[in-house]
């Protein structure tokens, strides 16, 4: 893949894109009770956090996950307002290069 550092999604755009994908696909991939829980609790405890891709993504994809071009977004619920996401509903791997639309999701089981 030929990618351009000057043609990347910003961190905010990456988070927004991941959240939009999550909302579109959650009902088909999560237990209905989890979808209900997420929808009821998101306003108070919901969050999306951006990370460099975790090493375990290499078990799911067969290409180099250069953190300049790939990001992992974790979507879920926190235990406190300032806390980290403790109740993960999805981990989303996105390519941040705008011309390479690529997304992989590990859903809560």
Swiss-Prot record:
Summary of the function given for this chain in its UniProt record: May act as a double-stranded DNA (dsDNA) mimic. Probably regulates the activity of a dsDNA-binding protein.
InterPro entries in the record: dsDNA_mimic_put (IPR007376), Put_dsDNA_mimic_sf (IPR036763)
Under HAMAP family, the record lists:
Put_dsDNA_mimic
Q: Name one Pfam family in it.
A: DUF440
Per the record, the domain of life is Bacteria
* The organism of origin for this protein: Shigella flexneri
Full protein name: Putative double-stranded DNA mimic protein YciU
| Family of the protein in this entry | Belongs to the putative dsDNA mimic protein family.
């Amino acid at each position: 893949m030929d990618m351009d550092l000057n043609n990347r999604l910003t961190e905010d755009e990456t988070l927004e894109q991941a959240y939009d994908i999550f909302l579109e696909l959650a009902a088909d991939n999560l237990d209905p009770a989890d979808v209900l829980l997420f929808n009821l609790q998101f306003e108070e405890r919901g969050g999306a956090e951006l990370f460099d891709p975790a090493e375990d993504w290499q078990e799911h994809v067969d290409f180099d996950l250069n953190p300049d071009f790939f990001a992992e977004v974790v979507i879920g619920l926190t235990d406190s307002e300032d806390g980290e996401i403790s109740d993960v509903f999805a981990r989303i791997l996105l390519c941040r290069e705008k011309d390479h639309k690529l997304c992989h999701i590990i859903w809560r089981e």
